[in-house]
UniProtKB/Swiss-Prot annotation:
Annotated keywords: Cytoplasm, tRNA processing
Record-level GO cellular component terms: sulfurtransferase complex
Gene3D superfamilies with a match to the protein in the record: DsrEFH-like
Protein name: Protein TusB
Length: 95
C-alpha cells in the first residue's frame, strides 16, 4: 500500500499511521508532510524503525527550504517517480 502524508506530522494521528504500516508498504511525504523527514524531529526515528521505504517529493522540499535538512534515510523523488509509486500500488491511504 502507498501511504501519502500531506499534512504536518504534528497535525496528524501519526501513531495511527505507524500502526497501519505493513512490511512492503511505502510512504510518500508531500506538502507539509515533508517536515516528518527533517533530521532531529521526533517522528523521524519512528519512520526509520518502520519496515517501509520513505520518499519525499523534492519540489515540496525545495518550496519549504528543507533540501539540506532532510534525513539521508528519506528518498527524494520527483513527480514522475510519484506517478510510478501510484501505479505500483493498487491501494492508497492519504493522511
Amino acid at each position: 500500500m502507498l501511504h501519502t502524508l500531506h499534512r504536518s506530522p504534528w497535525l496528524t494521528d501519526f501513531a495511527a499511521l505507524l500502526r497501519l504500516l505493513s512490511e512492503g508498504d511505502e510512504l510518500l511525504l508531500l506538502q507539509d508532510g515533508v517536515t516528518a523527514g527533517v533530521d532531529g524531529n521526533c517522528y523521524l526515528e519512528s519512520l526509520r524503525n518502520a519496515p517501509i521505504k520513505v520518499y519525499a517529493l523534492n519540489e515540496d522540499l525545495i518550496a519549504r527550504g528543507l533540501t539540506g535538512r532532510i534525513s539521508n534515510d528519506i528518498i527524494p523523488i520527483d513527480y514522475t517517480d510519484f506517478v510510478r509509486l501510484t501505479v505500483k500500488h493498487s491501494s492508497q491511504m492519504a493522511w
